[in-house]
Amino acid sequence: MAFEVFEKLEAKVQQAIDTITLLQMEIEELKEKNNSLSQEVQQAQNNRESLVNENEQLRQEQNVWQERLRGLLSKMDEV
C-alpha cells in the first residue's frame, strides 16, 4: 500500500514538473513576443514622430504658399 502511495505521489510530482516546464516555456515565448511587440511599438512611435514633423513642415510650406498667393492676388486686384 505504501508503494502505491509513493507511485501516486511520484506521478503527481512528475505532472507538476511537466506543468512547470510547460509554463516556463510559455513564459519564454511570451517574453519574446513582448519584446517583439515593444520593438514594434517603439518603431511606430518613431514613425509617428517623423510624420508629425513632416506634417508640421508641410503646414509651414502651405502657409508660405498661401501668403505668396494672397500677395499675388492683391497685386492683381490693384491692377
From Swiss-Prot:
Does the keyword Nucleotide-binding feature in the UniProt annotation? no
Gene Ontology CC: one annotated term = cytoplasm
Gene symbol of the encoding locus: zapB
Q: What's the protein name?
A: Cell division protein ZapB
Q: In which compartments does the protein localize? A: Cytoplasm
Would the keyword Protein transport be found if you checked this record's keyword annotation? no
Q: Which organism is it from?
A: Sodalis glossinidius (strain morsitans)
Q: How does it assemble?
A: Homodimer. The ends of the coiled-coil dimer bind to each other, forming polymers. Interacts with FtsZ.
Q: Name one Pfam family in it.
A: ZapB
